[in-house]
Amino acid sequence: MRVLKFGGTSLANPERFSQAAKLIEQAHLEEQAAGVLSAPAKITNHLVALSEKAALNQSTDTHFNEAIEIFYNIINGLHTENNQFDLNGTKALIDAEFVQIKGLLEEIRQAGKVEDAVKATIDCRGEKLSIAMMKAWFEARGYSVHIVDPVKQLLAKGGYLESSVEIEESTKRVDAANIAKDKVVLMAGFTAGNEKGELVLLGRNGSDYSAACLAACLGASVCEIWTDVDGVYTCDPRLVPDARLLPTLSYREAMELSYFGAKVIHPRTIGPLLPQNIPCVIKNTGNPSAPGSIIDGNVKSESLQVKGITNLDNLAMFNVSGPGMQGMVGMASRVFSAMSGAGISVILITQSSSEYSISFCVPVKSAEVAKTVLETEFANELNEHQLEPIEVIKDLSIISVVGDGMKQAKGIAARFFSALAQANISIVAIAQGSSERSISAVVPQNKAIEAVKATHQALFNNKKVVDMFLVGVGGVGGELIEQVKRQKEYLAKKNVEIRVCAIANSNRMLLDENGLNLEDWKNDLENATQPSDFDVLLSFIKLHHVVNPVFVDCTSAESVAGLYARALKEGFHVVTPNKKANTRELVYYNELRQNAQASQHKFLYETNVGAGLPVIENLQNLLAAGDELEYFEGILSGSLSFIFGKLEEGLSLSEVTALAREKGFTEPDPRDDLSGQDVARKLLILAREAGIELELSDVEVEGVLPKGFSDGKSADEFMAMLPQLDEEFKTRVATAKAEGKVLRYVGKISEGKCKVSIVAVDLNNPLYKVKDGENALAFYTRYYQPIPLLLRGYGAGNAVTAAGIFADILRTLQH
C-alpha cells in the first residue's frame, strides 16, 4: 500500500486536481494506493474567516461565495474533462455542506462567539469536499472507492482544534474495516475523532500528519507528500534561488527542520512513520518525474554535513533573571510548568552557566499570556527583588542550522556565527541540541531573511557574491561596467559573481535585485523611469535582504560623498574614487571610519590617490607594521605630469594644455587641473592616513595659474587667454634647465605640513624622470631612507582608475 497526500496547492484548480487524481490512479495500478487530501488552496482560509466574522456579526458573504466558487470551478473542469463525472450529484453535496455551514454561522452570530467544536466542524469542510470530488472522479473512471472516515477510525486525544492520533488503537480500527485490495482508498486529512466520537482537528496544516498516521495504520510501503516544490531544499528556494535539493534526509533531520520552520512538511509527520521505518517521499505534483526527497532511517553519510537552514518567525523571548535564581532548586521547573499549565509551547531554551538567568522563546501571540503567568508564578520573588522584572523581547526569529553530520564536523558553528556577524546581524541568543544535530541563533525578525541568505552562502555555496550599486556612469563608471562584463567568465571560474543591482546617474536609475542585464545598459538607463534617490536604494536593500551590498561612487560630487556615512551605517560597503569625502572636515572624515568599524563594513578609496596604483594600501600596511612617515614628495596629477613633461620638451604652456585637453587628460575645463586643488586633496588624504590632522584649507597651494587669472571667463575663453603665460613658463623652464633641473608639480608633506607647488628638481631626485602622465610617490619613512619607497606608474585614465575600483570591490569579499 502506498499513501499519497496532496496539499491545497496540488488541488487548487481542475487541472491540478486531475493531475493529483491521475497520480493516485497510477500508484493504485502499481500497488494499492490511498489518497489523503487537503482542502483546495484558499478554502481553509475562507472557512476560518467565516466563523471569525460571524462571531463579530460581520458580513460573511464574500468568503462564503468565493469558497463555493472554488469548488464549482473544480467540478465544472472535471466534468469537462470527463462527462461521466457526476457533476449534479457532486454539486448537490457541495451545496448541502454549505447549507450546513450557513446554519452553523447563524448559531455563531446568535451566541456572539465560536465554540471550538463548531469551529472544528466548519474548518474541515474543505477536506471533506475534496474527498467527495475525488471519489466522483474515480467512480467516473469505473473504480470502486473505499472511504476511510477519520472521525471513526483515527482515535485522537487532545482539544477540538489540535489533537494527536493514538496509532495503536487507530490501527485496530483501520484493520477492522477489511479494505478490499481492489479498492482505491481515500481519506480526508486534518481530522480525526476523540473518544466520544466527536470530530477533532489535527492542527493547522495537519494533513501531512494525517497521511503519516494512515500510512502507519496500514503498514504502508511509503508515505508520499505531494506538494508544489520538488522536495526538501537546503533552505527556502524563494529566499535563496540557488538553494540545493536534498535527495535524502534522516527522520531526525527532517523533524528538526520542520520544527524550526521548514514549510515542506508538518512537524509531527515523522513521528508515526519512524517506528516502522516507513519512508516519507516529498514530491512535486507539477513535476512528478523529479526524484524528490526521501526521508527515512537508512540515510548513509554523505558530503553534506549540514542539511538545511530554517527560519521560524513571530517569536518573543523571555528573560527570567535575578540573584534569587542562583543555586535555587526548582526555578527552571517552575518556569516551564507555568508555561505548560497555560498551554504555551516553549520553542527554544537557553540558560547561563551561572544559573543567573533562563531565556526561552514562545510564539509572539502567546507573549502577553506568558508574561502574566510568569508574573503570577513569581510574584513573591519579584516583590522581594529576588528576580528582576520579566524581560520580553518581541519580533524575533530563530535561524537554525540542521544536519546529522554536524556532530563530526568541525567549524560549522564558527562559519554560522561568522556569516551572521559579516551580515551585520546581532545575535540575541544561541542554543544547541544535546544531539549536536542543530544549532540555533535568535535574531531580530527584520534580519531573518538576510541571516538565511548569509548562512546559506557560508555553508553551501562556494560562490562569493557582490551586489553592486553604482552611482556615476561617466568615463570611469562606464569603463567599470565594461570591465565587470569582460571579467564575468574569469571571476566565475574563481567562484565570484558581481551582480550590478543598480546603475544611477544624476537623473535616473535602474534597479534589479537579481542583477541588471548589462548588454544595453546605456540605452536602458536613458529610458529608465525611476528617479535617482538614495532613499530608494536603502529601501531596496532592506526589501530584498541584500547580504553584501557595495555602494560605488564614480562621481566627483560633494553631495554623493555626503551620503557615505549613512550608507555605511545602513549596511553598505563603500568604494569610491571620489576624493570629496576624505577631504571634507575632519569630523566627517572620522565619522566615516567610525561607522565602517561599527557596522563591520569596508570604506575603500584606493583610487583617491594614484588611480590604479596601490598607494593607500601600501601606506596603511607600512603604518600598521610600526613604520612612520617622515617626509613625502610626489607627482600626484597625471595631467600635470603630462603638461610639465611636455614643457621640458619645448612646447609652450598653451600648446601642451590644449594637447592634454584634446587627449582627455584634463577635465573639460583645464583650470580644474591647473588650480592645484586636486593635488591638494590627494596630498591631504595621504597626510591624514599618516595621522596628521589637517583641513583642506591648511594645505598651501601654488597653482599653475596666477590668482584671478581668467576669473569669470568660460573654458574656451580661458584657453584663448592662456598664451599670455607662455613666455613666463618658457623662462622658468630655461632657468631650471640651466641648473640641470626640470620643473615638476610636486606635493610635499614635511613636519606636519602640506604644500603643493612648482619645483625644480635635479637628476638625483626620484621625480626627475617622471612625466607623460605618470605619477610617482616617494615615501621617506623610518624604514625607507635615504632611499625612499617609490611607487610609480600611470595615475590617470579611465581604464586604470576603473581597474583600481574593481580591485576595491573585490576586497569587500575579504570582509
UniProtKB/Swiss-Prot annotation:
NAD(+) binds at V473, G475, V476, A504, T555, G797. The active site is at K682 (proton donor). A sodium ion is seen in the structure; a metal ion may subtly affect the relative position of the nucleotide-binding region to influence enzyme activity, and could increase the stability of the enzyme. L-homoserine binds at E667, D678. GO terms for biological process: homoserine biosynthetic process; lysine biosynthetic process via diaminopimelate; methionine biosynthetic process; threonine biosynthetic process. Na(+) binds at E606, V609, A611, L613. Residues 250-470 are annotated as: Interface. Its EC number is 2.7.2.4, 1.1.1.3. It catalyses: L-homoserine + NADP(+) = L-aspartate 4-semialdehyde + NADPH + H(+); L-homoserine + NAD(+) = L-aspartate 4-semialdehyde + NADH + H(+); L-aspartate + ATP = 4-phospho-L-aspartate + ADP. InterPro entries: AceGlu_kinase-like_sf (IPR036393), ACT-like_dom_sf (IPR045865), ACT_Aspartokinase (IPR054352), ACT_dom (IPR002912), AK-HD (IPR049638), Asp/Glu/Uridylate_kinase (IPR001048), Asp/hSer_DH_NAD-bd (IPR005106), Asp_kinase (IPR001341). Residues 1-249 are annotated as: Aspartokinase. The gene is thrA. Its cofactor is a metal cation. Keywords: Allosteric enzyme, Amino-acid biosynthesis, ATP-binding, Kinase, Lysine biosynthesis, Metal-binding, Methionine biosynthesis, Multifunctional enzyme, NAD, NADP, Nucleotide-binding, Oxidoreductase, Repeat, Sodium, Threonine biosynthesis, Transferase. It comes from the Bacteria. Homotetramer. Pathway: Amino-acid biosynthesis; L-lysine biosynthesis via DAP pathway; (S)-tetrahydrodipicolinate from L-aspartate: step 1/4; Amino-acid biosynthesis; L-methionine biosynthesis via de novo pathway; L-homoserine from L-aspartate: step 1/3; Amino-acid biosynthesis; L-methionine biosynthesis via de novo pathway; L-homoserine from L-aspartate: step 3/3; Amino-acid biosynthesis; L-threonine biosynthesis; L-threonine from L-aspartate: step 1/5. The lineage of its organism: Bacteria, Pseudomonadati, Pseudomonadota, Gammaproteobacteria, Pasteurellales. NADPH binds at V476, T555, S556, K579, G797. CDD domains: ACT_AKi-HSDH-ThrA-like_1 (cd04921), ACT_AKi-HSDH-ThrA_2 (cd04922). GO terms for molecular function: aspartate kinase activity; ATP binding; homoserine dehydrogenase activity; metal ion binding; NAD+ binding; NADP binding. NADP(+) binds at V476, T555, K579, G664, E667, G797. Residues 320-392, 401-478 form the ACT domain. This is Bifunctional aspartokinase/homoserine dehydrogenase. PANTHER family: HOMOSERINE DEHYDROGENASE, PTHR43070.
